[in-house]
């Protein structure tokens, strides 16, 4: 794998540090008036998603991580693993609950997802930015009941709970932003 100098760190670069893959989120090169230049780098730990800030000397380097993002189609969940398929080679890949995490509530059959692989194993699953789901349970919206915040909780077909406007009813299909978990619009 390639070795990168701290001067080469850019957003999106994936490096190995302490035996784990990290993604560079931002890098600021600092050249003080006195002393050695350094890079102040914000990193995201790919295995857990936690953020770390680290300072690298200008002479430091890091090995590139063998991390690949693949567009795969979600097939099904067998109770233990979530199964995905590569549309070009038709190979199937199984991701465990640790890799899928909270994104399980946004996975629909045949949805195109981005699966991040490290050493051939899935470490994270990113669902599509927007999904269309049916409302299976919500309180009825009463006419003129706008004294509150103007929203009510609704349970969707995947089990996710989203705050929706008062006019939305059971059985309607809504569009949800998976990054924030917020209601976007009704689907006609």
UniProtKB/Swiss-Prot annotation:
Question: What the entry says about post-translational processing?
Answer: May be beta-lysylated on the epsilon-amino group of Lys-34 by the combined action of EpmA and EpmB, and then hydroxylated on the C5 position of the same residue by EpmC (if this protein is present). Lysylation is critical for the stimulatory effect of EF-P on peptide-bond formation. The lysylation moiety may extend toward the peptidyltransferase center and stabilize the terminal 3-CCA end of the tRNA. Hydroxylation of the C5 position on Lys-34 may allow additional potential stabilizing hydrogen-bond interactions with the P-tRNA.
Protein family (similarity comment): Belongs to the elongation factor P family.
The primary location reported for this protein is cytoplasm
Q: In the record, which residues are listed under signal peptide?
A: none
This protein's pathway: Protein biosynthesis; polypeptide chain elongation
Question: InterPro entries in the record, alphabetically?
Answer: Elong-fact-P_C (IPR015365), NA-bd_OB-fold (IPR012340), Rib_uL2_dom2 (IPR014722), Transl_elong_fac_P/YeiP (IPR020599), Transl_elong_KOW-like (IPR013185), Transl_elong_P/YeiP_cen (IPR001059), Transl_elong_P/YeiP_CS (IPR013852), Transl_elongation_fac_P (IPR011768)
Taxonomy-wise, where does this protein's organism fall, top ranks first? Answer: Bacteria, Pseudomonadati, Pseudomonadota, Gammaproteobacteria, Enterobacterales
* Biological processes per GO annotation: peptide biosynthetic process
Supply the name of the protein: Elongation factor P
Q: Which PROSITE patterns match?
A: EFP (PS01275)
Q: Which organism is it from?
A: Cronobacter sakazakii (strain ATCC BAA-894)
Q: Where is this gene product found? A: Cytoplasm
Q: Which of the residues bear the PTM N6-(3,6-diaminohexanoyl)-5-hydroxylysine?
A: 34
- What does the function comment of this entry state? Involved in peptide bond synthesis. Alleviates ribosome stalling that occurs when 3 or more consecutive Pro residues or the sequence PPG is present in a protein, possibly by augmenting the peptidyl transferase activity of the ribosome. Modification of Lys-34 is required for alleviation.
What is one cellular component GO term in this UniProt entry?
Answer: cytosol
Protein biosynthesis as a keyword of this entry, yes or no, is: yes
């Amino acid at each position: 794998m390639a070795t990168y100098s701290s001067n080469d760190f850019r957003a999106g670069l994936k490096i190995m540090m302490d035996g784990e893959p990290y993604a560079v989120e931002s890098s600021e090169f600092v050249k003080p008036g006195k002393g050695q230049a350094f890079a102040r780098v914000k990193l995201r730990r790919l295995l857990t998603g936690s953020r770390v800030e680290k300072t690298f000397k200008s002479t430091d380097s890091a090995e590139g991580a063998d991390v690949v993002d693949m567009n795969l189609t979600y097939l099904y969940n067998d109770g233990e693993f979530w199964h995905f398929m590569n549309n070009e080679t038709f190979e199937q890949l199984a991701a465990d609950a640790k890799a899928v995490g909270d994104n399980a509530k946004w996975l629909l059959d045949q949805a195109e997802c981005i699966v991040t692989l490290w050493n051939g194993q899935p470490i994270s699953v990113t669902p599509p930015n927007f999904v269309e789901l049916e409302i299976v349970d919500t309180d009825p919206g009463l006419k003129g009941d706008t004294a509150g915040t103007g929203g009510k909780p609704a349970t969707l077909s995947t089990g996710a709970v989203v705050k929706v406007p008062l006019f939305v009813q059971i059985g309607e299909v809504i569009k949800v932003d998976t990054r924030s978990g917020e209601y976007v619009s009704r689907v006609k």
